[in-house]
Amino acid sequence: EERRIIIIDNASNLSLESGLKKMETIDKMSKYGITLRNQLKFIFVLIQHQAQAQEGIENQKLNKLKPSSDGLADCKTTTRDANMVIGLYSPFKYGLREYEGYDITKFRNHIRFMEVIEDRDYGANGQICPLFFDGAVSTFYELPRPDDREALQRVYNYMESRKSKTAKTFFSYRINKMNKELHRWKIFHKFAA
């Protein structure tokens, strides 16, 4: 079975439709998505960021930092058109040490939580899936449960091995570059003398 998926990344970057403001343009694109879904059976994915105000001090005080429908930037009505709204949350970004049973201090910026914010088909609202995020290659993997110590240790070991490879690679690169520059300098001075 073939599936056709259209992904728009992101709604705020859409070029304005003639005579429309940003919010109206995003809303119109969302309506196009409904048509594509209903008439052509396409899967329409509209990526939409949270408003900057959502990360403000007041929301931090109230602990309202997770993505929400009412926190969407530029056009909040797109959630009415969606079968499912999913949010990605980084507790590390807000300095949390623990979240949903996971030690954020160990994962640092390598953990995200995918939460179903709205679901009109299956009733999965509020379901959370912890994800390992490897930003170097832009991939996500589902994490083991927080009480599965062995599986989590394998993830920690993987992160440690990636960190040492990255450091070694960067270090090797710098040494090679310095050697080449030193070699050029020696040749230049030999020629100049």
Label each region the model flagged.
Residues 10, 46-51:
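A short beta-strand-to-loop transition that corresponds to the Sensor-1 phosphate-sensing loop
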Residues 1-36:
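Phosphate-binding/switch loop-helix module in NTP-utilizing enzymes
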Residues 1-3, 7, 38-40, 53-193:
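C-terminal regions of RecA-like/P-loop NTPase motor modules
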Residues 13-19, 52-53, 92-93:
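Short acidic, S/G/P-rich loop/turn micro-motifs used as interaction or catalytic elements
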